[in-house]
């Protein structure tokens, strides 16, 4: 069994609380499960995701376990084939988001014309809503795309709380687990696999 891990497990406060109060504690808890599952379950991170996580944790507290239990591997981008429908879906999704972002901007302009004393607040609201319209539910970084490609290459399960990653995993037929239940999954695996030689 193979898992490809996203940063949300260790960094997103809503998800991380299942593993620890801060990113380092969350990683320590995860590594304790990885140690019990060593040789039976593999945990991967693309290099970009690994670097991202390392910005949030105290690496000195986590070595050598983090190097032993998390396999850093980039996807083989020169060999992987992506179905054409993915490109069609992406183009259509981007077009919808641009239109939605335009409507958000138009609404903000109308509000600013009516309420000229409150322009700064309207701009903040515009930025927040524009960002939500364009980025929520889409793969919006190279690191997110690497995560999906690596899971596809390895026939692994993605672990993430990112709606965009999970949406595209579903579209591409990739197995996934929401980060919010990952600790329960690990506990179940430890219970099932303890003492078994797989």
UniProtKB/Swiss-Prot annotation:
Q: What task does this protein carry out?
A: RNA-free RNase P that catalyzes the removal of the 5'-leader sequence from pre-tRNA to produce the mature 5'-terminus.
Query: Which keywords accompany this UniProt record?
Result: Endonuclease, Hydrolase, Nuclease, tRNA processing
Q: Per the similarity annotation, which family is this?
A: Belongs to the HARP family.
Q: Which InterPro entries does the entry mention? A: PIN-like_dom_sf, RNA_free_RNase_P
Q: Which GO terms describe its molecular function?
A: ribonuclease P activity
Catalytic reaction equation(s): Endonucleolytic cleavage of RNA, removing 5'-extranucleotides from tRNA precursor
- This protein's name: RNA-free ribonuclease P
One BP annotation, GO: tRNA 5'-leader removal
Record flagged with keyword Hydrolase: yes
State which Enzyme Commission number(s) the record gives. Answer: 3.1.26.5
Q: Sorted alphabetically, which NCBIfam families does this protein's record hold?
A: PRK04358.1-3, RNA_lig_partner
Q: Write down the top EC class of this protein.
A: hydrolase
């Amino acid at each position: 069994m193979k898992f490809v891990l996203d940063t949300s497990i260790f960094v997103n406060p809503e998800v991380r609380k299942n593993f620890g109060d801060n990113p380092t504690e969350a990683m320590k808890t995860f590594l304790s499960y990885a140690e019990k599952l060593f040789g039976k379950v593999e945990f991967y991170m693309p290099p970009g995701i690994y670097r991202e996580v390392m910005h949030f944790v105290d690496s000195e507290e986590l070595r050598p376990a983090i190097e032993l239990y998390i396999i850093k591997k980039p996807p083989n981008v020169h060999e992987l084939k992506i179905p054409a429908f993915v490109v069609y879906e992406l183009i259509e999704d981007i077009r919808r988001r641009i239109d939605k972002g335009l409507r958000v901007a138009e609404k903000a302009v109308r509000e600013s014309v009516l309420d000229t004393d409150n322009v700064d607040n309207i701009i903040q609201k515009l930025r927040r809503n524009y960002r939500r319209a364009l980025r929520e539910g889409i793969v919006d970084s190279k690191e997110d795309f690497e995560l999906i490609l690596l899971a596809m290459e390895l026939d692994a399960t993605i672990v993430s709380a990112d709606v965009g990653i999970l949406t595209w995993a579903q579209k591409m037929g990739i197995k996934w687990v929401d980060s919010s239940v990952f600790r329960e999954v690990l506990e179940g695996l430890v219970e099932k696999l303890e003492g078994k030689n797989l």
